[in-house]
Amino acid sequence: MKLKTLVKVLAVGLVLVGTHVPSTPREATPPPPQPHINLDVCGAPSLPVARVKARALITQIRADLAAVEEEIRHVPFLSAVEAGTVPVAQIAAVAAEEYSIIRSDMQSFTSMAQRWDTPNGSHFFSDLAAGEALALPLLLTFGAHVGLDEQALAAYEPRPKAQTYPSRVAGIAANADRASAAASFLVNFGVFGENMARLRAALSGVYGFAPEAIAFFTFFAEPIPGFEEDALEVIAVGLLEGACPRDVRRSARLLQAYELDFWQAAADPPGSPLPVIGPPMP
């Protein structure tokens, strides 16, 4: 009995000692190595690498175009509208230009959707086309508040410099790859939305338009939920298909330059006379 008891005591002691002996520290598992991303090489070997490359490419493009974005933000037209010194007819000319732009972009986005969207996959471009379709009646509402019906908007003669943007979008629809298309709009929509938000604020606070009258500007001022992630995925798929970063950068640079064209043209005289009326002042 004593021997058995002693054996039990020794066994328990060994167990207790074992539980208090510090174990040899394990080396932390290093994170998997990040793939080397060369932004001068076309394509990507896999979708995960393409996703990393898409983000890196957009970061690079945004840095490259930062100066142009600042020009877009600081065009004299916006400051003048905020100061209340721009005639309503000239502001209405922006809407008249947008009438041509929206109708053109709607067709271009529809063409892109036919090229790149899939029934059970991406609907990125069809969503953009649907957005233009929603914006058009809002634009007509603004036109009605300044005395312009759709016939008057259609009769307006656009300024060439204000229409370089939709011409480029049509070119993207016909000739670009999906990565170049998605990157161009991802980089562009942010600053366009900022300027539309400033117009909305000035039209409300300075010119006295009611919220329902300027819903068109509100529509484009608000960011699209999930837009960046959706665009990055389309860019990644395009890179996986062999798209070249050089082409993606070029497309984004051109579209942003044409965005600047639009806002600079807004300060020029309207392309043709517009029979506008002023807003009801508070």
Language-model region placement:
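Acidic, carboxylate-rich catalytic segments that either coordinate divalent cations
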Residues: P245-M281
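Signal peptide processing junction and immediate N-terminal pro/mature segment
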Residues: H20-P30
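C-terminal, helix-dominated tail/subdomain
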Residues: P166, F216-P223, L240-Q256
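Bacterial N-terminal signal peptides that target proteins for export
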Residues: M1-V7
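Bacterial N-terminal signal peptides
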Residues: V9-G18
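Active-site-proximal alpha-helical scaffolds that flank and shape metal-associated catalytic sites
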Residues: V49, Q60, S122-P223
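Alpha-helical bundle segments that constitute or directly flank the non-heme di-iron/ferroxidase center
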Residues: R62-R73, V81-R115, S180-R198, Y258-W263
